[in-house]
Amino acid sequence: MYATFLLAVGALALCSGRVQANPQLMSEVDTQAATEVSYANFQQWLRDFRQYAAGQGISEATLNKALDGVRYRERVIELDGYQPEFVRPIWEYLDTAVSSTRITNGQEKLADHRNTAQQMEQRYGVPAEIIVAIWGIESNYGSNFGDFSTLESLATLAYDGRRRDFARGELLAALRIIDQGDIAAEDMKGSWAGAMGHTQFIPSSFEAYAVDGDGDGRRDIWDSIPDVMASTANYLDRAGWQSGQPWGVEVRLPEGFDYAQTERRSSAEWRNQGVQAQQGELPNFDSAAIVIPAGANGPAFLVGANFRAILRYNNATSYALAVATLGDAIAGREGIQHSWPRDQAPLTRDDVQELQRALNRVGYSVGGADGVMGPNTRQGLRNFQRDQGLIPDGFATQELLEQLRQRSQ
C-alpha cells in the first residue's frame, strides 16, 4: 500500500507539470521493491532447498521445526561483505586477544573447571590451558558466542553470500545435527558466519569432532562445558596434537640468518644454524619452522606440530599465536620477550592491492590483487627484497611499498 501511495504522488506531480521526481521517494520505492523481490526469491530458494534436504534424508519433522519461519537476514550479508580498511597489525590483535583481563578470566575458568579440563587433557593429550585458551579466544569464555540463528545465517549465506556452495553444505549439516537430537532448532545459535557455541564449531566440524563429554547422550557445545572441552580437545587431537610437546618457543636468530627459509627442519638443524631459545633450550622437534609474523624487527618463533594443529582450527598465524601465548599465560609461563615494531604504520587494504599489482608489474608474480597478504604475496615480496639486497622477511611496510612504486613506474 505504501508503494502504491508513492506512485500516486509521482503521478500527481506529472499531472501538475512538475516532471522531476523526488529522489528520496523514488529511493524508498526502489528499496522496498528490491526487498520484496529478494524476499520472494529467497522463499522460493528455501522451498527448493527443503526438497533437496528431504532427499538427503532429513526428516519432515526437522524440516518443519528448522525451516518454517526462517528469514533472510540482510545484516548477515552486510557482515559477509565487510572488508576493513586497515590490515590490523598482529601486535594490536594480540593486545586484545591476550589481554590481562582475558588471562585472569582464563585462570579463573580453569580453576572452576579444573577437574573436567584435566580429564580431557588425560584423554586427548591436549593441555588444559590450551583448551581454555581456545575457549577464551573463540567466545571470551562463553560470554560472546553470538545470538544469530545459525539456520537463518546459513540459509542467507547459501542464498546470497560469497561462498554459497560452502554455506549450503553447512546448512545441510546443521539440519543433520538437529535431526540427530543434539540441539533444538531454536537453540542453535552462533556467529553471523554459522560458527556455533562456546568454541565456534561450524556444523561440519561439529559433525566430525563434537563429543558428548558429560555422557547425557547429546553433544552440546552451547550449554555443557564438559562437551565443549571434550570437543575442543578432540579437534586438536585429530588435527595432530602431540602430547608432551610444546607448541613452540620464542627464539633468537643469528646475525646473517636467511629469513627466506620457509621449510621445516629439525631442532638440531636449526640449532646448527645458530638459532637459540630466548630462555632455556630449544624443544626437541623433528619438524619445525621459523615464524616471524612481524618481520626481522619483531619476535621470532620456532613452531612445531602443535602450532600446526592450532592452525587447523583457524588457519591464521595471528590466531595460533594468540591461542599459544594465552595458554602459556594462563599456565603462568612468561610471555613474548622481544618487542614488536609498533612504529610501523599499518598498510590499508588498498595499499596491499597496490603492492601486489606493483610486484606483478616488476616480474614477481603473486596472482590477483585481493588486498590480502597471503603466502604468494609474501613469497613474491621476499624475492623482491632479496634481489634488492634487503632482508627477505616478507613483511610489508610503507617503505617497501614506496620502493615498489618507484620501480614499477
Locations of the language-model features?
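Bacterial N-terminal signal peptides
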Residues: T4-C15
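Boundary at the C-terminal end of the N-terminal hydrophobic targeting segment
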Residues: V19-P23
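Extracytoplasmic and endomembrane cell-envelope/extracellular-matrix remodeling and assembly machinery
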Residues: A33-V70, I77-P84, I103, L157-G194, ...
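Signal peptide-directed extracytoplasmic domains
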Residues: V70-H113, Q119
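Active-site-adjacent structural elements in enzyme catalytic domains
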Residues: K109-S139
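Short, conserved phosphate-binding/catalytic loop or strand-edge motifs used
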Residues: I137, F148-A155
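Short acidic, glycine/serine/threonine-rich helix-capping segments at coil-helix boundaries
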Residues: L347-V352, N360-L404
